[in-house]
Amino acid sequence: MAIILGIDPGSRVIGYGVIRQVGRQLSYLGSGCIRTKVDDLPSRLKLIYAGVTEIITQFQPDYFAIEQVFMAKNADSALKLGQARGVAIVAAVNQELPVFEYAARQVKQTVVGIGSAEKSQVQHMVRTLLKLPANPQADAADALAIAITHCHVSQNAMQMSESRLNLARGRLR
């Protein structure tokens, strides 16, 4: 069993999603958004750090998964996003959580099957995969999708390791 915290970073709204993985079964534990309503960036970063730390304390995840920075057309926005990601990652590292990063395209490919999927498609698939009564809000759905991606990637890595181990055992006999 593992609890995974997914984070969809932003400088004003940070989505989070928490799921439990038992074997191949995924279950929803919680999701939402950290909203920073102050204008100055240092205060927003402080709120992000405090919010992520609070979520970690509440859910006690085993793994922390976050979306990688994409290259935005606006350099200022990309820098602010990078700082928000950094603060969230520091919150995880301070709690000694292993951090995993996934590209947005990989998350969409894993959850929807199309790397260029729309937000509404991600919301629908997250709802379906986690058996939720309604679509989660967009940023929370993205965070849940990041957590789901981590489960799939780690599951595949474990299967590959087992296959290699079985091959090695076969050669040793």
Curated annotation (Swiss-Prot):
Binds 2 Mg(2+) ion per subunit. Keywords: Cytoplasm, DNA damage, DNA recombination, DNA repair, DNA-binding, Endonuclease, Hydrolase, Magnesium, Metal-binding, Nuclease. It comes from the Bacteria. GO terms for cellular component: cytoplasm; Holliday junction resolvase complex. Mg(2+) 2 binds at E67. It catalyses: Endonucleolytic cleavage at a junction such as a reciprocal single-stranded crossover between two homologous DNA duplexes (Holliday junction). GO terms for biological process: DNA recombination; DNA repair. Belongs to the RuvC family. This is Crossover junction endodeoxyribonuclease RuvC. It comes from Shigella sonnei (strain Ss046).
